[in-house]
């Protein structure tokens, strides 16, 4: 069933959609995501069920010919693959979770303009999280908008200040969301 709900900031819209879910799992997929394998969703659900996980994510890959963006995503995947043992992070473009756990954790935090996926993911138990060995595809638009160094610096600062509420309150989100 498809139902159109009122929009708003990303966290708000995702939480309103999650309120409508009547199944044991919620799968958040951004509209511009592409898959490289037809079994990606099935394999993610299988991992969640067979390993009794609460949260499953994928690796990200650039689907256009931008070598710098491809390298940027590869570096991000490498860092996320190392950090997954300490801080779970399922990128919001593909995030599969148990509804019960999503509700228990309070859903996506609605007070920040970006990184809602990180703030929710880090609440999950690392033992109940897995990155499945599949990729979802993204284009290079964020790199184009913010510049390659700008995007890398943005991610580094966000990670560094991840526990600093004042940083997030004063962050200029327009650079991330604006169209070039």
Predicted regions and their residues:
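Glycine-rich, basic loop-to-helix element that forms the pyrophosphate-binding segment
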Residues: 5-21
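Conserved nucleotide-sugar donor-binding
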Residues: 22-23, 91-105
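Short aromatic/hydrophobic "clamp" motif used to bind/position activated sugar donors
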Residues: 26
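Conserved donor NDP-sugar-binding/catalytic core segment of glycosyltransferases
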Residues: 38-68
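A recurrent flexible, glycine/aromatic-enriched loop bordering the glycosyltransferase active site
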Residues: 60-67, 78-97
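Acidic donor-binding loop at a coil-to-helix junction in glycosyltransferase catalytic cores
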Residues: 113-120
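Catalytic donor-sugar/metal-binding loop of nucleotide-sugar-dependent glycosyltransferases
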Residues: 121-137
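Active-site donor/metal-binding and catalytic loop motifs
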Residues: 132-148
């Amino acid at each position: 069933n498809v139902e159109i709900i009122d929009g708003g900031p990303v966290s708000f819209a995702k939480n309103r959609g999650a309120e409508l879910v009547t199944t044991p799992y919620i799968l958040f997929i951004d509209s511009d995501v592409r898959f490289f394998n037809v079994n990606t969703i099935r394999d993610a659900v299988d991992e969640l069920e067979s390993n009794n996980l609460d949260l499953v994510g994928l690796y990200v890959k650039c689907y256009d010919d931008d070598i710098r963006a491809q390298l940027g995503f590869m570096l991000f995947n490498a860092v996320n693959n190392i950090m997954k043992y300490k801080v779970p992070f399922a990128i919001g473009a593909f995030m599969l979770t148990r509804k019960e756990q999503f509700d228990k954790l309070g859903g996506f935090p609605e007070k920040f303009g970006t990184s809602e996926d990180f703030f929710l993911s880090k609440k999950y138990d690392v033992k109940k999280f897995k990155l499945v060995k599949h990729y979802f595809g993204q284009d290079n638009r964020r790199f184009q908008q913010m510049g390659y160094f700008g995007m890398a610096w943005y991610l580094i600062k966000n990670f560094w200040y991840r526990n600093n509420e004042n940083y997030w309150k004063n962050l200029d989100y327009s650079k991330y969301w604006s169209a070039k």
